[in-house]
Amino acid sequence: MRSDRSRKRFVFLCVAPATILFFIFMILPTLNVFRMSLYERGAYSPNETFVGLKNFQHLLKDTQFIRSMQNMILLVVVVTIITFAFALVFAAILTREKIKGQNFFRIIFYIPNILSVVVISGIFSAIYKPENGMLNSILGLFRDMTDPILWKGEKLVIPSIIIAMVWQAVGYYMVMYMASMSSVPASLYESANLDGAGRLTQFFQITIPLVWTNIRTTLTFFIISTINMAFLFVKAMTSGGPNGASDVALNYMYSQKDAGLYGYSMAIGVVIFLFSFALSACVNRATSREPLEF
């Protein structure tokens, strides 16, 4: 009896500091964002005016906010699909095909993940330069480049950011999936070969189901992190330009805060928070299935 109490007291003492810090630095600020979204406040004035849902009503009429949300959703969906497709395929190839120098390729693919967003943005901004960038220089060997392609222009800026984001993320998830795939027993693939199953069938019927738990977990984390990464890449590469073509919701939120519209920016933050929560819940629900064991 005394040992049970001692154990509970020990657990409480271990958990209490983290719980208190989480409440102070996560829960309270989040609740304060919800509160501030219902008020109107100037940049340098401590006075607040309660406006209820007025800020949210303005959001529905704000075309730039709607555009920034569309850009954010597009980046999240496309980057997630491409990143996970490449990561799974590369992981399967490097794990199953017994390629020489496997560790070398693992390191090469992983390097972009250890670079900062600023460095990656600088690299791709140099590649995308209209006058002497690598892309236009290569294309100049095959066609007339009197009018250089504006890779960061209004039409191509989102695809250009997508490429940079995928390049940064794919190696990390490839390494994670390689670790999962390497634990799948070779006997399962041998049995599938005897039954006449091809590589593609084995990939979808054996590999994917057996590493699905890992895929599901990483998918949820990646989608949420992509919302933040999209903001970082946009801020570093374009600052939302040109003419707001690459603006995302988080970047627009900060621009409204810098303009002194604190309550309005907090309303944008609430929408992003609810969107992230709803999206993660939908992904969890859509990807839930009975785990397979081997």
Q: Which residues make up each language-model segment?
A:
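A structural signal for multi-pass alpha-helical bundles of membrane permease subunits
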Residues: 2-294
